[in-house]
Amino acid sequence: DANGTPAIAADGRIRFDALTFWTDSGSLPPPDEDAGEVAGRDGRVVARGGAGQRTPGFVTGSPQEANGLGGRTIYYDRTSSSLGRLNVDVTTAAALQSDFGAATAAESAELIAFSRGLDVDDLDGDGERNEPRGWLFGDALHSRPLPLNYGSIGGYSDPANPAIFIAVGSDDGMLRMIRNTRAGGSDSGEEIWAFMPRASMGAQKVLRANGTGMQHPYTMDGAPVAFMYDKNQDGSIISGDGDRVFLYAGMRRGGKAYYALDVTNPENPRLMWTIEKGGDFSELGLTFSTPRVGLIDTATGPRPVVMFAGGYDVNKDKRGVIGSDDSEGNAMYVVDAETGALIWKARGGSGGGGGNVFEHAQLVDSIPSTLSVADTDGDGFTDRMVVGDTGGNIWRADIHGRDVSNWKLTLLASVGRHAGGAPSFETDRRFFHRPDLVPSKDGNGLFDAVVLGSGNRADPLDKGGSAYNFMYMIKDRRTSVGSGVDTGLQHVDFGDVTSNCLQSNGGCIVNLVHGWRLGLEEPGEKVLATALTLTGKTFFTTYLPFSGTGATACSPSEGAGRLYAVSL
């Protein structure tokens, strides 16, 4: 930890007496010793230290009602391509009244103040409202912190202390930019700015009410990704050199939108574009799919692009029923990284190829997964995307060449409810996570191993009547440009290695020409993460839900996890 002492306890969690690096130990509140808290330490208690404690105006002063007053700097999307200041003023309150769901402009102003972190309801009863609430950093439930290394800029001259900023989304409605260390080398963790899109403002009333029994609100819950371009490759991001840093983020269950910000200057963001459901993106569902960035070849040279799947349809939230076709989310997109303009998409339908839209009749299930992308011929351009959907189908999109009308979508395999026979709970397999794509070969030649596991992430605790889930390895032998012809492969076409017969001495024979499948035999066991293949071995984890409650009657059951290692 910050004091050089062991930070991790025997149970795998942070020790109560640990001090994290950004935390100011002298500014911590008195500990709750009954809960295990330690004086001068934040330890495993989230709402004591870290970046949350470093939020401007939290420890001293105030978050303030407006940017530029020594408190927080918060922006919102004034238009789809410009930022406004989220200030407590008459004009802003009136403009955002409907976005906040406020009955009056006065309530809208209160919700802006609440969003900025002010104690508008005097929760501590001291009569002061221009002070911080008890905690100002929402949960980063599914988002992941993204470190961005800007090198030697703005006073950061020591190579051992580059200018690193961290972007992360959270369910209080914000995408934050956090400073790692100061130019002099001391720890920071300070929030430089935050971005609250209009799409997440409606949740502020729920957060403010904080009522018993209210459902947890989701807002900016997606993991951000970045496109970084260091033109002269000097290790520093300097706008005058032609360098660029673009940041992209979705909302997962928080909404149906993607946002792109130019953060070439990490302290002065610019909104580049917004993609929302409608128009070219009429198929867009909840933006579960973390964007991928890459380059494609065009007549005018390399072109940066953003790639993502159509997202999640809440139709698949229904419990106790077999999955059915979705009305949104059944698509894949490639867009211009700088403008957000659609370059190509695949969607459900019977039209086939032509223009910048490819339709496939069997693309009827939403795709919450992040895409696996690849450069199959090593020319520096992304030319393939692979993904599974919530109907148990695995897809490959070939985006090779400059003519997008030749790009195509192929059904690699169908291992869920569509795979022959009447759909059943047992075959209602769903894919939520990015496949692991591994160039490989066997006695029949080269193939791309597509490794992915099934499991309904939207209902992780389900164990009764749930699908019999599997980990699959599919041998895709179209290692260069795909044919566009569906393989026809189904669940039964992959060798069943569940019994471990490949390691037995009994002469068990399994046909692995198309790949293999490994059954997850515990009730409700499911894959909830992407596999990793190293040196010919695939590692993956599973989740096992437990019945009953946790340590107390009101606490949840954590369940258990398993780690598997399987020879590819």
Question: Each predicted region: which residue ranges?
Answer:
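Beta-propeller fold recognition
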Residues: D1-L568
